[in-house]
């Protein structure tokens, strides 16, 4: 085990112990599980321990921790896995057991609604292992790990085995498995080596009586877990070792915990899963999951209303060829394209799901599915309302969201070249449009204006390329809402009539959902009316104020966020959403806010890309489960050039994973959104994650938040006195981290002599962090001589290999000192222009500054005009040559804006611009607040 350094014990089980360890070869933290020393001489248990590792290694699923390595040489028997930050389900349940009063936070975390998605993920993992022929045989809260980023993983595969394997009989023979009579069943909470496999408390009755394990024994354990989630208690209460006769009845979850508001059907699901007779249980985990679906996240139950055949004219009011460019010019690639056009005779309500499949060839030509309002469609205005256009080119599928004939959103993803058909699902409900292709989310759009009855419209060239179309309606939507009348007025833009009816409903149903929903829609009505007819949008805020403290309180902040969004007050919009999420994290309306966050993310990617980073951070922190693997890949690609421009990403070579603490820190750095830094600091400190702590202090310093920096520094000093940091490949330890932080504090206080003493005592990588932070401060404060000496000391003590990392700062000093010769030599030798410079790189900007120093203003303008990305940071820096308005900087994210101001100031100094010109940029840089909110 020389490769691994054990940091601390995480947990202990029946056979093994799990440690947090440092992998020296890969410079990463891992979880290392080794067989207990008191059991290491038992050949049967060694065999079972290795079988556990091999089974886990063969299973690939998000709910199963992958195995990195397995070692069985000599006395050492262990295997390693990724370390997942989090806690066990048992830990969460134990925190509320036998407590009469719970804190609000704990009550929300352990609510039925909060537990159901967790249970579904557990079931999904068990369904997967059953499909691979594996039985876990020891499912219990102890073996369920809840990660900080929404992960739900099953651990401890010591009892796992393949169904019908020979080992089942061998275990009985070798372990002396004896058949227990009904009256002799005892219960404990731990796997008993040498007797029975599994934890008796969670074993099905037939297993305790000696029957072989099966899928239904795992289902029984799942049922017990669900029972505990619903009731926060175990179904039977017996002292350890006490017999439990089967004649004792088990109370249903509703009877056990009547205060928990458990739906009767959910209670029945739990009781069916723990039925004594295996025949009465669910036949499979898939069946169990299917029964749960209507309860998950308030998901609507759908019923098939009709199936429309594209070949049967009776289903369609209009069924004729059209010239695509006549109605949808934005979609037509050729003015002479003719398509089959079909408009349904039936009318669908506002909650509808449309399902069909289309061939690859038809998508290459383009397929449209639209929802025109019946009133407009009957007048031949087929382009009105919402619609989707599906097209593909070069193995890329694109989905465009069309509103009133205008494309408002477009998303594209790669497809498998051999794929011949695509399954499409479009759902319109609760003011939300979601579009899935082959179960992958393409479009999420929210419109708070209600829609009236609509028809289904299909546009396709070849009718053979589309299947029959299934129309499903929400069961809840089949009931006519009292809000339907004012919704109809609002859809017709009859704002005064709509407002009058919304007020009536609000006053008629005090304390009920209809009341607060009517008040929210009243606010949307007034906001829309002001936006269309002119006026102060902020007047609508008072309408949403009336929701304060009501049963629909989160909608107050959602409504205000809508006002601020339309008013262009982005910071206030974010503040409103955060208040709702902080005050009401488990409120039934919070999923609505999470959906809104997702919509704003996708919408900002399409319209305001700088805002997207903030929404990305919020979703990563609050609702990471909303982001799928395909979206993760897309977002990582979107962030790639910023990653290349971030110092701590270049120094720390650990890959930037989307759902990680490092990504949260990365987004905090770029957005200036430091609200989550205290939690990130505490997490890194508890994990003794040296590199993460360095990065956090760098980000805090870059933000300029001295108060947070001081608090973190005090906490770190106390912590380092109490613990020992693990060695890394660079022998970096806690003492060096303290020196580094003291050096940064000295730089902040302009105590340069002390700063030099502290920073000179730390490794070069840490010196580079300090150098980068000092460079911004030194040039803005015009203390370049001190910085130059600091830089020279670091350069002299660094290795030849490390010299390349400080070249940018040396060039900056040369340019500031107007040393054209040295600046040119450094630039041409290390960043030759003929090799092609990346336009968002520091070197590209420094070449522009060099040209400015030569006095050739036209050459400088030509240099920056070469930028392909006209709204990229480098292109915007060039605008300062002729424009001092700073308005063009508003589209930049916080750190981009700050860096652009600095580099524009530096460029103007090189251009020998009048002081009053470059002082505008200097003061703008200084005046930037030290955080997102200011």
From Swiss-Prot:
It catalyses: L-seryl-[protein] + ATP = O-phospho-L-seryl-[protein] + ADP + H(+); L-threonyl-[protein] + ATP = O-phospho-L-threonyl-[protein] + ADP + H(+). ATP binds at residues 10-18, 33. The active site is at residue 138. GO terms for molecular function: ATP binding; protein serine kinase activity; protein serine/threonine kinase activity. SUPFAM superfamilies: Protein kinase-like (PK-like). NCBIfam families: PRK13184.1. PANTHER family: MITOGEN-ACTIVATED PROTEIN KINASE KINASE KINASE 20-RELATED, SERINE_THREONINE-PROTEIN KINASE YBDM-RELATED. HAMAP family: PknD_kinase. Belongs to the protein kinase superfamily. Ser/Thr protein kinase family. Together with the serine/threonine kinase Pkn1, may play a role in the specific interactions with host proteins during intracellular growth. This is Serine/threonine-protein kinase PknD. The gene is pknD.
């Amino acid at each position: 085990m020389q490769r691994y350094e054990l940091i601390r014990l995480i947990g202990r089980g029946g056979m093994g112990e799990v440690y947090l360890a440092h992998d020296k070869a890969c410079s990463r933290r891992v979880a290392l599980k080794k067989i207990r020393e008191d059991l290491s001489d038992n050949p049967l248990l060694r065999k079972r321990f290795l079988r556990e590792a091999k089974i886990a290694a063969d299973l690939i699923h998000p709910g199963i921790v992958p195995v990195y390595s397995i070692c069985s040489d000599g006395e050492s028997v262990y295997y390693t896995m990724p370390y997942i930050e989090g806690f066990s389900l048992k830990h969460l349940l134990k925190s509320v057991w036998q407590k009469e009063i719970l804190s609000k936070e704990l009550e929300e975390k352990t609510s039925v609604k909060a537990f159901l998605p967790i249970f579904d993920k557990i079931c999904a993992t068990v369904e997967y292992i059953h499909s691979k022929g594996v039985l876990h045989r020891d499912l219990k809260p102890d073996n369920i790990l809840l990660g900080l980023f929404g992960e739900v993983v099953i651990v401890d595969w010591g009892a796992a085995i393949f169904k019908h394997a020979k080992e089942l009989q061998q275990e009985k023979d070798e372990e002396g498995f004896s058949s227990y009579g009904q009256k002799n069943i005892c219960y404990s909470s731990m796997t008993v080596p040498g007797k029975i496999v599994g934890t008796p408390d969670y074993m099905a009755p037939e297993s305790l009586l000696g029957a072989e394990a099966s899928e239904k024994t795992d289902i029984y354990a799942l049922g017990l877990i669900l029972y505990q989630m619903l009731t926060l208690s175990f179904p039977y209460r017996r002292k350890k070792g006490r017999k439990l006769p089967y004649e004792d009845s088990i109370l249903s979850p509703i009877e056990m915990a009547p205060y928990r508001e458990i739906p009767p059907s959910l209670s029945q699901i739990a009781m069916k899963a723990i039925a004594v007779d295996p025949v009465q249980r669910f036949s499979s985990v898939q069946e169990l999951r299917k029964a749960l679906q209507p309860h998950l996240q308030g998901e609507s139950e759908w019923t098939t209303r009709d199936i429309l055949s594209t070949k049967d004219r009776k289903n369609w009011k209009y069924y004729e060829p059209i010239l695509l460019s006549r109605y949808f010019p934005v979609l037509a690639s050729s003015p002479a394209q003719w398509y089959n056009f079909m408009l349904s005779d039936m009318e669908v309500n506002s909650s509808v799901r449309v399902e069909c499949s289309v061939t690859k060839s038809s998508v290459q030509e383009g397929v449209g599915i639209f929802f025109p309002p019946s009133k407009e469609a009957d007048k031949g205005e087929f382009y009105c309302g919402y619609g989707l256009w599906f097209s593909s080119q070069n193995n890329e599928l694109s989905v465009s969201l069309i509103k009133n004939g205008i494309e408002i959103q477009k998303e594209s993803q790669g497809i498998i070249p051999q794929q011949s058909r695509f399954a499409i699902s479009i759902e319109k409900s609760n003011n939300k449009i979601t579009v899935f292709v082959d179960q992958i989310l393409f479009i999420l759009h929210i419109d708070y204006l209600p829609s009236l009855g609509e028809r289904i419209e299909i546009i396709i060239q070849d009718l053979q390329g589309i299947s029959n179309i299934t129309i499903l309606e929400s069961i809840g939507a089949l009931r006519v809402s009292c809000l339907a009348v004012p919704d109809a007025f609002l859809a017709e833009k009859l704002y005064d009539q709509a407002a009058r009816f919304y007020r009536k409903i609000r006053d008629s149903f005090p304390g009920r959902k209809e009341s607060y929903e009517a008040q929210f829609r009243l606010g949307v009505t007034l906001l829309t009316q002001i936006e269309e007819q002119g006026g102060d949008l902020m007047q609508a805020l008072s309408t949403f104020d009336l929701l304060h403290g009501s049963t629909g309180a989160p909608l107050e902040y959602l409504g205000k966020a809508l006002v601020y969004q339309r008013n262009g007050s982005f910071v206030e919009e974010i503040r409103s959403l955060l208040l709702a999420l902080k005050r009401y994290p488990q409120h039934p309306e919070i999923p609505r806010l999470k959906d809104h966050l997702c919509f704003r993310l996708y919408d900002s990617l399409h319209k305001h890309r700088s805002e997207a980073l903030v929404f990305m951070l919020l979703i990563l922190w609050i609702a990471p489960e909303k982001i799928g693997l395909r979206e993760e890949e897309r977002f990582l690609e979107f962030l790639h050039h910023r990653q290349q421009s971030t110092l701590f990403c270049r120094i720390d070579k650990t890959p930037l994973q989307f759902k990680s603490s490092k990504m949260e820190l990365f987004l905090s750095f770029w957005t200036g959104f430091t609200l989550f830094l205290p939690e990130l600091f505490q997490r890194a400190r508890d994990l003794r994650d040296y590199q993460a702590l360095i990065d956090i202090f760098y980000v805090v310093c870059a933000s300029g938040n001295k108060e947070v920096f001081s608090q973190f520094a005090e906490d770190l000093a106390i912590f380092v006195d109490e613990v020992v940091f693990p060695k890394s490949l660079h022998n970096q330890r806690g003492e060096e981290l303290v020196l580094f932080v003291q050096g940064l504090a000295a730089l902040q206080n302009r105590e340069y002599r002390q700063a030099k003493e502290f920073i000179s005592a730390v490794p070069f990588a840490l010196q580079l962090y300090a150098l980068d932070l000092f460079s911004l401060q030194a040039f803005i404060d015009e203390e370049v001589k001190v910085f130059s000496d600091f830089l020279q000391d670091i350069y002299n003590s660094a290795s030849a290999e490390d010299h390349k990392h400080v070249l940018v700062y040396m060039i900056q000093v040369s340019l500031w000192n107007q040393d054209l010769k040295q600046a040119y030599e450094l630039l041409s030798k290390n960043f030759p222009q003929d090799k092609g410079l990346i336009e968002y790189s520091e070197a590209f900007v420094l070449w522009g500054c060099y040209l400015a120093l030569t006095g050739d203003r036209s050459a400088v303008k030509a240099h920056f005009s070469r930028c392909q990305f006209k709204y990229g940071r480098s292109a915007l820096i060039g605008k300062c040559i002729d424009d001092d308005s700073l308005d063009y900087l508003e589209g930049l994210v916080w750190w981009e804006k700050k860096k652009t101001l600095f580099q524009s100031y530096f460029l103007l100094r090189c251009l020998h611009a009048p002081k009053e010109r470059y002082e505008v940029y200097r003061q703008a840089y200084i005046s930037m607040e030290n955080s997102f909110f200011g």
